[in-house]
Amino acid sequence: MNRLLLFFSLNIIGLHFYGQGKNDLSIHYYIEAAKANSPLIADFRNQSEIEQAELERLKAMYTHSRLELNGDYLFVPVVSKDGGHAEFKWNARSATDYYGYDLGESSGSFHTVLTWTQPLLGKTSYKVAQGQAKLNTDMARNRTRMEEHPLERSVTEQYLLCLLDKAQIDYTDSVSAVIERQTHIVRKLVENGFSKQSDLNLLAIEREANMELLTAFRQAYHTHLMDLNLLCGIADTTDVDLPVLQLPIRWPVNDKPSLFTEQYRLDSLNISLSLRSFNLQYKPKLDLFVNGGLQVGDFAGWYRHFGWSAGLTFSWTIFDGKQKRWKERQALWQQGSIRTYKENSEYQRNMRIKQCLSELHRYDQRERTLENQIAEYETILSDYGKELNIGQVSVLDYITVLRNKIQTERDRLLLRTNRQLVIAAYNYWNW
C-alpha cells in the first residue's frame, strides 16, 4: 500500500513539473533557448578558454626554462688507395692516397648534447602577452554580446508575430459567436415571417467566410510558431499557447556609453597592443644556457669525452631599415579609421532612436483614432442589433457595419503589434 501511494505521489509530482515546463513558454524561455543552441555563441564563449590556454603557453615560453636534447652523427666516406688497392671506407680516420673530402678539414664526428635554457629578460614580453590575451578575452566576450543582442531582437520579433496571429484567432472566434447569436435571432424572425430567407443565407455566408479566416489565422500561427522554434533550436512541432507580451521601453541611462561602441574601443586597444608586441623585437634578449653530453671525432676512447659547458646568449636589434617607424604610421592610420567608423555608427544609432520615438508617437495617435472608430461601430451595432430583433433593419446593413468594425479591429491589432516591434527596435538600438 505504501509503495502504491509513493508511486502515485511521484507521478503527480512528475506531471506537475512537466506541465509547469510546458506552460513556462515566456519570451525569456525562447531567448535563453536560442542563446543555448547557437553554435556561434558557443564558439565565442570557447574563445575565452582558448585565450586562457594561450596565455599559459606564452608564460611558459617567456619565463620558464626549456630542456632540449640534440644530436648528430657525421660520416665522411672516402675511397682509399693505400697499400696499392682501392677500398671504400664509410668513415675513414686516416688515409694518405684517397678520393674524398680532405680529412684534415673534415672528419666524422658524433655529438649528443642536453641543453637547458632559461630566459632572463622575458618578464616584459610576458606582460605584453598577458595584456593581449586579456584583450582577446574581452573581445570574445564582446562578440558574444554582439551576437546575443540581435538574436534577442529576432526572437522577440518572431514571438510578436505569433502573438498577432493568436490575437487574430481570438478575435475571429468572438466574431463567430456574434454571427451565431444573430443567426439564431434571424432564424426566429424568418420562422415568424418577419424576415427573409435570404437574410439567413447572408449570415450563413458570413459565418463560412469567418471560419475560413479562422483556419487561415491558425495556419499562420502554426507556421510562425515553427519558425520561432527553428530560430531557437527547439525540436517541437506541436502548437502551444504563448503568453501575452507587453514590451517595456528601456530608456537610456545618462553618462553611460552605448555597448555598440565597445567594439571600437576594443579594436583601438588591439592596435595599440599589437604595436607593443611588434616593438618587443627591439628589446634586448638575454638567455642563460647549460649543456652537457658527448662530443667526439675519434671513437677510440669516446667514454673520456663526456663534458658540459655554460654561457649566455645575447641579441639586440640596432637598425631594421625604419620598419618600426612605418609600423607606427600604420597604427596611426588604423586608429583614424576606427574613429571614423565609430562616429558613423553612433550617428546612425542616434538617428534610429529618434526614428523609433517618432513612430511611437504616431502609433499612439493612430490607436486613439481607431479606438474612437471602434466605439462608434459598437454603438451602431448595438442599435442595429435591437432593430434587427424587431425586423426594422436589414441583415445586409448589419453585416456591412460588422465587416467595417472587424476590419478596424484587425487594423488596431496590427497597429499594436507594429508598435511593439518599434519598441523592440528602440530597445535594440538604445543598448
Where are these regions (language model features)?
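Sec-dependent N-terminal signal peptides
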Residues: L4-I13
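Bacterial Sec-pathway N-terminal export signals of envelope proteins
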Residues: S9, F17-V78, F194-K196, N229-S274, ...
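Acidic, low-complexity, intrinsically disordered peripheral segments
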Residues: Q20, L25-I27, Y62, L74-G84, ...
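Periplasmic alpha-helical coiled-coil/stalk elements that build and connect Gram-negative outer-membrane
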Residues: L25, Y29, T144-L259, E359, ...
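Small/polar (Gly/Ser/Thr/Ala-rich) solvent-exposed segments
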Residues: A42, R66-K81, Y101-S107, T117-E147, ...
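Amphipathic alpha-helical coiled-coil segments
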Residues: D43-L58, E147, L151-D170, H224, ...
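Flexible, solvent-exposed loop segments that connect beta-strands
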Residues: S80-L103
